[in-house]
A protein has these predicted regions:
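Hydrophobic alpha-helical core bundles mediating ligand binding, dimerization, or RNAP-core interactions
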Residues: 42, 57-61, 84, 123-127, ...
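Alpha-helical elements of Rossmann-like donor-binding domains used by nucleotide-donor carbohydrate transfer enzymes
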Residues: 40-41, 56, 86-90, 122, ...
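A metal-dependent, Asp-based hydrolase signature
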Residues: 45, 51, 64-122
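Active-site neighborhood of HAD-like aspartate-dependent phosphohydrolases
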Residues: 8-62
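Hydrophobic side chains within well-formed alpha-helices
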Residues: 38, 53, 119, 170-173
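Short, acidic loop-to-helix structural element flanking the phosphoryl-transfer center
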Residues: 77, 81-82, 101, 114-151, ...
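Asp-based, Mg2+/Mn2+-dependent phosphohydrolase catalytic module
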Residues: 2-21, 141, 153-259
Length: 259
């Protein structure tokens, strides 16, 4: 393959001093794997609701990670796979069942599992093999060729991450696949970001953390990582007074850290 991949211009905003990083860690969901690629199947299963269902599912999934991490010192922790299912069930109940109930003027009463259990399982199975963004494989191969250590640092369970990596064809391209599950705390808890330092043996300021989730890029920046926010959808960044080290529009922007 070519020695370099043309990268889109990246906006450097810079909290950290300019320095060459020694490793790269990627968020998984939304960054390497397209969480909204389930919308097509969702539309097939729930006509007229596919896009809205995929968005609400994702929003509720993130909300649940924060809820179980911050409430009562994590006493209500559940693995990411369980929260993913719970968020999906919530989204279906809100968007599909509530609408049907409204049309029936409140007279609808169903057994959720009997009526929707198969659809739920099909969507969860799809979540195990989400589409990867098209440039990602070439970027990971390029980093591997350059000898730059890479890894995933994700809220996902280990089994979920292993399945997604395999399905995307990324096996052998990542040196670390790090799940927060052993510490029972989701990002943006500082202990979650600390796992990257522990796995690589490097200080956070020597690592680029890459995420397409603005809240995640912000949390990693606050922790001390050099950060790349992959702003695929041309959105504003969080308005909390801190910017990521760089902003790009796809994963190729990470190569700008290694001129």
């Amino acid at each position: 393959m070519p020695n370099s991949i043309p990268a889109l211009p990246a906006q450097t905003v810079g909290l950290h001093p300019a320095q060459h990083p020694r490793a790269v860690l990627f968020d998984a969901y939304g960054t390497l794997f397209d969480v909204f690629s389930v919308a097509q199947l969702a539309e097939t299963l729930f006509p007229g609701h596919g896009q809205a269902l995929s968005v609400l599912w994702r929003d509720k999934q993130i909300e649940y990670t924060r809820l179980v991490t911050t409430c009562n010192l994590g006493a209500h922790y559940q693995p990411f796979s369980a929260l993913t299912r719970a968020a999906l069930v919530f989204a279906i109940k809100k968007l599909v069942i509530n609408e049907a109930s409204t049309r029936a003027k409140g007279q609808i009463d169903i057994n959720f599992e009997a009526k929707h259990g198969r659809q739920v399982q099909r969507l969860l199975d799809q979540y195990q093999q989400l589409n990867a963004f098209p440039e990602n494989l070439a970027v990971l191969q390029e980093l591997k060729t350059r000898g730059i250590p890479t890894g995933i640092l994700s809220n996902g369970d280990q089994a979920m991450l292993d399945a997604a990596v395999h399905a995307a064809g990324f096996s052998g391209l990542l040196d670390h696949i790090i799940s927060v599950d052993p510490i029972r705390k989701f990002k943006t808890h500082p202990d979650a970001y600390a796992l990257g330092e522990q796995a690589t043996g490097l200080a956070a300021h020597d690592i680029v953390f890459v995420s397409s989730n603005a809240w995640d890029a912000l949390g990693a920046t606050w922790y001390g990582y050099q950060t790349l926010w992959v702003n695929r959808y041309h959105l504003p960044f969080e308005e909390l007074g801190t910017q990521p080290t760089r902003t790009g529009h796809d994963l190729r922007a990470v190569l700008d850290f290694f001129p």
